[in-house]
Amino acid sequence: MSVKAIRNIIFDLGGVILNIDPQLTVDAFRNLGWNDFYESGNQPLIKELFRNLESGNSSPEAFRDNVRQMLKYQKDDAEIDTAWTAMILDIPADRIRYLEELKKSYRIFLLSNTNEIHRIKFHMRFEADFGYSFYDLFERNFYSHEMGMRKPNPQIYLQALKESNLEPEETLIIDDMEENIEAAKTTGMKVLHIQPGTLLESLPDYLKDNH
């Protein structure tokens, strides 16, 4: 049986296209007075809080209220959002130029575990830096909080494939998280696991060897 050529590429966002530093958010919350943020005893509760936001099970308003309860201080929405989005850094222009070139030969998509507070932040940053909507960079943007589930749930990959009418065997997915890559493999897609910030070093070589 012949191997089908890659026609579609699904990108992760954070660590692949967007530079992020989660430690900056940890530091920002500590600066708000959350001194035991992410210490071992709090980790399960914190992870549940973040995952509920990313899967759309919690609204931004409920998230902020939960953060206020944990802070035990009445910080306003803007202070909480600033701390929560502190991890969001830049999108290097050379990555965007590369994606714009890829669009000439491939259908490109985005599939990201994210939330509405972060989405607003990086969309605004992208438009300020590049002069057009982030929605226009990809054929379709799939966000976990809008889909009601998050990676590595295999169903999120299957739904993205179905809604975009993609054949798994013709689709490459790129992610910097090994657990997400392992889940994507179960759908029949081709996979590329990269280290954060190495898209321009990793993808061209992969496509050259797997054209």
Predicted features along the sequence, with ranges:
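Hydrophobic beta-strand scaffold residues
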Residues: 108-110, 191
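Short amphipathic alpha-helical segments and helix-helix/interface helices
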Residues: 26, 96-100, 181
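Generic structural signal for small/hydrophobic residues in well-ordered secondary structure
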Residues: 12-15, 56, 102, 110, ...
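Asp-based, Mg2+/Mn2+-dependent phosphohydrolase catalytic module
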Residues: 1-7, 116, 122-211
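Glycine-centered loop/turn motif at secondary-structure junctions
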Residues: 33-36, 72, 106, 165, ...
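Catalytic-core regions built around general acid/base machinery
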Residues: 94-105, 137
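N-terminal helical cap/lid subdomain that shapes the substrate entry/recognition surface
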Residues: 3-93, 104, 115
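Alpha-helical transmembrane segments and their immediate juxtamembrane flanks
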Residues: 95-98, 112-120
